[in-house]
Amino acid sequence: MTNKLYEKIKNFIKANYKFIIFYIVFILLFTVSFDYEIYTPGGLSNLDDRIIMDDEYPSKGTFNLTYVNAKKGTLPMILLSYIIPSWDLVSIDDSRIENEDYDEILKRGKIDLTSVNSNAIVAAFNEANLDYKVDKNDLTVYYVFDSSHTNLKVGDIITKVDNVSVNNADEFRNIINTKKSGDTVEFTIIRNNKTMKKTGEIYESDGSLLVGIYLTNVMEVSTDKNIKFKYSGNESGSSGGLMSALEIYNNITKHDITKGLTIAGTGTISSTGEVGEIAGVKYKLAGAVKNKADVFIAPTNNYKEALSEKEKNNYDIKIIEAKTFKQVLESLEDL
């Protein structure tokens, strides 16, 4: 029985080996990806569907997030990127620090998203002269360098160093500066909602005492509007901060600043309203034009590129420069 089955398999392979080889090669071509992504023009995401709150004021127009379509770097996609003018081949290393893996990149992006959403609330409520409450401002591990000797991970919230409470990077630094190279320090942290102890060995680099981590404060705020953000599990990053702040502001003030227009844009935002640059503005602008947006808002450091793309491609869209949140509101008022 076994011999007959073996003979059948062998004969089938002999008769169909060319097809089998072709099939395997075909599957590999479209499934095996390299350390590249292909950036292509993206689209719009209406923030009415992303930010939910109580007692919203009505709006005739819309504020929209813009995004870049990133395709996996399979061989056919890589080859097409050399043929299609609006497609660009980008190394994944461009968004990677040292040797971090995809999960670490995503965790950093989630930290950015949480932080910028809170910044958007604060910037909007400050401009509208409305109250909000800072519930948390966690000292969070944003990155762990390869040179470190610690069991801390990205996303850990540090509450104490050697049993001394810390609230920000300066307080953390002051404690580390009392140590010497080779000392081991103990961290009290929160990871996955559980309090635990971790350690790190101090080392010296360029005259500074280091643990080998990058820290950031992540704020969470609450308001009487019960604001909720709706994002999928693989969405992350801070580039939607400005547009989120505009959406929130428009929902909490009587005057409709959209004026019935489809307004798209991009840019990070700080809690004090400063707008920061982003990557991929030409793909975001192309997506906005493709989806018939009336206005595109670009951060100052991306503004010239956006204007250049508009002129080069003869785009029919109004482009606004974004320096600060307050200035963007004034520019929208002047439309």
Stretches with model-predicted labels:
Residues F125, G155-I158, D162, F187, ...:
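Terminal peptide-recognition signature
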Residues N251, S271-K304:
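Glycine- and Gly-Pro-enriched alpha-helical subdomains that act as flexible
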